[in-house]
Amino acid sequence: MSVALLDINDCNLQLWGADSAVQSPGYALLEGKDYRFGTAARSSARLRPRDINNRFWWQLSTEPLQPALGPARHTADLVHAHLQQVHREAGQPAELLLACSGSMQREQLSLLLGIAQHCPFTAVGLVNRSALLGSLLGGRGRLFHLELQLHQALLTVLQDTGDEVSVQRSVPLPGCGLLQLQERLVEVAASAFIRQTRFDPRRQASTEQSLYDVLPTALQALASQPETNIEVSGYRARVSAADMTAAGQRLITAATDAMGAMQATDRIIADPLVALLPGLQDSFSQLSVADANALWLAAQQHGDHLVNREGSVSFVTHLP
């Protein structure tokens, strides 16, 4: 497929092209009268909380920005600036296929397409990211897609007839977003530091930020071993997967309730990020983890079927 793919999930926007893949979390940091986005902004979240906005994708609108953050009038201005930065970092591809979550409202999708018209690329397609993923990993029966966003989780229910995968509904899981999960995981890790070393990394913004920064590496280690060490500011604490499991219980319970009674042919697909949560895979026997580049592979599989260079772009929610 000659068109680049932009996966819009505020935990980590990803833009794939023929020769590159760019990642950029949905964080904006005010620097003077300008903004920094992505990993650089996220690494300042605990250090400069008043200069950070991480809600601009979730609350995409043209309502006045509250609280104010520099020259941006509304979250749409921040989305516009973030899109331009990601596009530049990816080598400025001429055309983009946009993959969006089912939690985005119709008005937000329309606004997003309007914003794209003021960017140096052409949006030639708009597809539900769960439908795109399901078309690659499908099989007959019900398919559930579990994804993490910064401020909530989302469970999307799909139906696969063998000929077509279609989105049936999307169920937000409030209080189960990445930020809430991080807070619970950090609390567990900080308790381990206090218990083992009497050092509390949450006492200072710099060490608290360091703890947040090393958390993903710790979770990756716990995916393959029962315990791991976390080091912050010269102090080291040992944490176990069993310790961390309680942090994800709210998400596991909410997802279980949203899926209802499971059938033998049902399948669950989890994004790689949510699959790092200790205890998740043990809780769902029918769960498989999507590859990190699964959406890009699915887009390439469909080729130009998803591309519309003539007329208006519509949100695709079912795919062969």
Regions found by a protein language model. Give the residues of each.
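Conserved phosphate-binding loops in N-terminal lobes of ATP-dependent enzymes
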Residues: 11-99, 219-226
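Small-residue (GG/TT-enriched) beta-loop-alpha framework at ligand/catalytic clefts
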Residues: 98, 106-195, 249, 253, ...
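Phosphate/oxyanion-binding active-site loops and adjacent basic polyanion-contact surfaces
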Residues: 71-83, 177-182, 240-252
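Helical "lid/coupling" subdomains associated with nucleotide-phosphate turnover
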Residues: 218-320
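Conserved, well-folded catalytic cores of nucleic-acid-processing
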Residues: 59-63, 85-89, 118-119, 188-196, ...
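Phosphate-binding glycine-rich/basic clefts of nucleotide- and phosphate-handling proteins
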Residues: 160-243, 266-277
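Phosphate/pyrophosphate-binding loops at sites that engage ATP/ADP/AMP, CoA/4′-phosphopantetheine
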Residues: 83-96, 194-204, 252-268
